Amino acid sequence: MAINRWFFSTNHKDIGTLYLIFGAWAGMVGTALSLLIRAELSQPGTLLGDDQIYNVIVTAHAFVMIFFMVMPVMIGGFGNWLVPLMIGAPDMAFPRMNNMSFWLLPPSLLLLLASAGVEAGAGTGWTVYPPLAGNMAHAGASVDLAIFSLHLAGISSILASINFITTIINMKPPAISQYQTPLFVWSILVTTILLLLSLPVLAAAITMLLTDRNLNTTFFDPAGGGDPILYQHLFWFFGHPEVYILILPGFGMISHVVAYYSGKKEPFGYMGMVWAMMAIGLLGFIVWAHHMFTVGMDVDTRAYFTSATMIIAIPTGVKVFSWLATLHGGSIKWETPLLWALGFIFLFTVGGLTGIVLANSSLDIVLHDTYYVVAHFHYVLSMGAVFAIMAGFIHWFPLFSGYTLHSTWTKTQFLVMFIGVNLTFFPQHFLGLAGMPRRYSDYPDAYALWNTVSSIGSLISLVAVIMFLFIIWEAFAPSGKVLSVELPHTNVEWLHGCPPPYHTYEEPAFVQVQRTYF
């Protein structure tokens, strides 16, 4: 029965598919919101109303893309589908908890959309800073609904994290050490540890905000001895690891895609890749105040956060050059996933360079809350995380579905998307350097040219999204069935055919390990 299969599923493949469909749907909602933003900013003057409605759209766009698109697709979708297959486990460690992790997300999204729909909406930005998020500036239920939405999404992520950590550590064949698992599995492990350590801090912060709003506490109100800066510290202690949570599974997917289409049996520098991910995970927790250079910290505090932030570039550079070394000397197959992966490597590096610029606290005083910051994080998210998702999706789509995507169309779609996102976000560097601030619905005429260019870019990206939907629809034609699988022995997830049977590894996998002595 379909209801039993999809609503009460305990199968990692079905739950992974649910996550992918949910993420695709949320991604379209988030894209629609982003187009409203770019329509408002396409020329000087007002289109939609006042700054409140504009900021509600901006806030909803951020939350939808982060919590309901990137995380469900990368961790819930690819993680659920691939981790058990890659380590030879019959399923996840806690299959019913896995189901609950997914089904907490639709109500969470519903609460978020409700928060935008009631009263005046939550026009706080995704950071939800008090006093703007307090009950004076935001009277009504909007911010409270957004807080509850975050609580549900957070519980979902914590449960999923416990599940993945347990699965990856305990459900490998005994003969396999952790240092023989694929890099995607490592990336999910590091990501879920980050989630488990950072989300409780966010929960604490927004719970205190909830009581400040409704129970007359003063955690963040100076009138009662509180401090709004405390909220910023708590939020960014979660918020900075969160941005690494969004990109780390992408690192894992890119490692697999680059190795596969370079004709290599493994990525260059496996151990270096693993340690780099662990280093990024650790360093991600000790740089949070670089989001707060403008709150008036001591010069020595700013010096520390500047240098600690720059140190993260080292393990990141290790990964970038290892990907390039994997490509070197390979027998390259120029298929669409590799194009996405190459786009990822280049554009993620550009985003990383603007990040190094922003790490300088003295420069950041000037660039903070300008479009330079928007350009920076959209290069690493809209062209890092999204490109990784596209590379992984097109690469593993035959595994998930048993059907192949049309090669020429996916290549065309890559080209359109590549032009669209770059045209959207590259001009924003110029706007930021010229001093245009974020989160305003209108601007002086001097900024009109690059804003118009940026908005045209967003329409090109929209065309690419619609093309992608058509390509997926077209793939399910009977002519597109997968007939054979290449290289299953170095890519263990393909071992069971396309698509794999409903239950894999019903008896424990037989593993013969060749001992290597380091």
From Swiss-Prot:
EC number: 7.1.1.9
Gene3D superfamilies xrefs: Cytochrome c oxidase-like, subunit I domain
GO terms of biological process kind: electron transport coupled proton transport; mitochondrial electron transport, cytochrome c to oxygen
Mitochondrial intermembrane topology ranges: 41-50, 118-140, 213-227, 287-298, 358-370, 434-446
Cofactor: heme; Cu cation
Binding-site residues, Mg(2+): 368-369
InterPro entries xref list: Cyt_c_oxase-like_su1_dom (IPR023616), Cyt_c_oxase-like_su1_sf (IPR036927), Cyt_C_Oxase_1 (IPR000883), Cyt_c_Oxase_su1_BS (IPR023615), Cyt_c_oxase_su1_dom (IPR033944)
Crosslink position(s): 1'-histidyl-3'-tyrosine (His-Tyr): 240-244
Pathway in which the depicted protein is active: Energy metabolism; oxidative phosphorylation
GO molecular function: cytochrome-c oxidase activity; heme binding; metal ion binding
Positions with a binding annotation for Na(+): 40, 45, 441
Cofactor note: Binds 2 heme A groups non-covalently per subunit.
Binding locations of Cu cation: 240, 290-291
Record-listed heme a3 binding positions: 376
Compartmental location: Mitochondrion inner membrane
PROSITE patterns assigned: COX1, COX1_CUB
UniProt GO cellular component terms: mitochondrial inner membrane; respiratory chain complex IV
Record-linked Pfam families: COX1
Residue intervals on the Mitochondrial matrix side: 1-11, 87-94, 171-182, 262-269, 328-335, 401-406, 479-518
Record has Magnesium as a keyword: yes
Transmembrane domains' residue ranges: 12-40, 51-86, 95-117, 141-170, 183-212, 228-261, 270-286, 299-327, 336-357, 371-400, 407-433, 447-478
Residues annotated for Fe(II)-heme a binding in this entry: 61, 378
Record note on quaternary structure: Component of the cytochrome c oxidase (complex IV, CIV), a multisubunit enzyme composed of 14 subunits. The complex is composed of a catalytic core of 3 subunits MT-CO1, MT-CO2 and MT-CO3, encoded in the mitochondrial DNA, and 11 supernumerary subunits COX4I, COX5A, COX5B, COX6A, COX6B, COX6C, COX7A, COX7B, COX7C, COX8 and NDUFA4, which are encoded in the nuclear genome.
Role according to the record: Component of the cytochrome c oxidase, the last enzyme in the mitochondrial electron transport chain which drives oxidative phosphorylation. The respiratory chain contains 3 multisubunit complexes succinate dehydrogenase (complex II, CII), ubiquinol-cytochrome c oxidoreductase (cytochrome b-c1 complex, complex III, CIII) and cytochrome c oxidase (complex IV, CIV), that cooperate to transfer electrons derived from NADH and succinate to molecular oxygen, creating an electrochemical gradient over the inner membrane that drives transmembrane transport and the ATP synthase.
Family per similarity comment: Belongs to the heme-copper respiratory oxidase family.
UniProt-recorded name of the protein: Cytochrome c oxidase subunit 1
Gene transcribed to yield this protein: MT-CO1
